[in-house]
Structures are given as structure tokens and as C-alpha cells.
Amino acid sequence: SLYAPSAVVISKTQGASADAPAQRAVTLRCLPVGGDHPAPEKACAALREAGGDPAALPRYVEDTGRVCTREYRPVTVSVQGVWDGRRIDHAQTFSNSCELEKQTASVYAF
């Protein structure tokens, strides 16, 4: 096959809109695991556990005890591509980067 069954582009944008220019973006390929994501095995495992649904990621994260400030500096993440042959086009905004990291673990850690 020309295309991996699960390959996505994950991006981060400062602000509350996924339409703003991305500050960072990485590729993540699963089966075979690869891309330029810094922890592709962990990110693929988290997405697999969430059934390929990025919106379901927060419920799978363990409580690390990390405390975040209440500052509002929104960060928007987006995931676009294909997961198990299904098209993914997801965007989600977090109140700040600490909340993003606390709630989503390895997928957006880049």
C-alpha cells in the first residue's frame, strides 16, 4: 500500500483558533511506527487506546499531581490525517500549555 493505515499531522497554535499559523507541527505514523514525533511509540499507543479519537485522549491520562496556574493563554492543537482508514480532522483548545500537557500526555508533547 502507498499509505500507512494510520498517519496524522499534529500541530500546535498559540491562541483559540486552529486557523492561525501553526507554531509547531509533527508527523506521526503508526504501523509502522515513525514520523518526526519525538515519542511515536507512546503517542501511537495513546491514540490506539482512545480508539483513534483525539477528543477521547484526556480520559486516558493518569493524574500526575501536576498543578497548573489559572492563566488564560490558549493553545489549540489539531490532528489531521487517517486512522485505521478513517479520516480524522480534530481541533481542541486548552486554556494554557500546562493544561494541554496535563490532560493529553504524549500525543501533543513536542
From Swiss-Prot:
Alphabetized GO MF terms: serine-type endopeptidase inhibitor activity
Matches recorded under Gene3D superfamilies: Subtilisin inhibitor-like (3.30.350.10)
Disulfide cysteine pairs (residue numbers): C30-C44, C68-C98
Pfam family, one: SSI
Site (Reactive bond): R70, E71
Location(s), subcellular: Secreted
GO cellular component: extracellular region
InterPro entries on file: Prot_inh_I16_SSI, Prot_inh_SSI_I16_CS, Subtilisin_inhibitor, Subtilisin_inhibitor-like_sf
Keywords: Disulfide bond, Protease inhibitor, Secreted, Serine protease inhibitor
Subunit structure: Homodimer.
Protein family membership: Belongs to the protease inhibitor I16 (SSI) family.
Function: Strong inhibitor of subtilisin BPN'.
Protein's name in the database: Subtilisin inhibitor-like protein 1
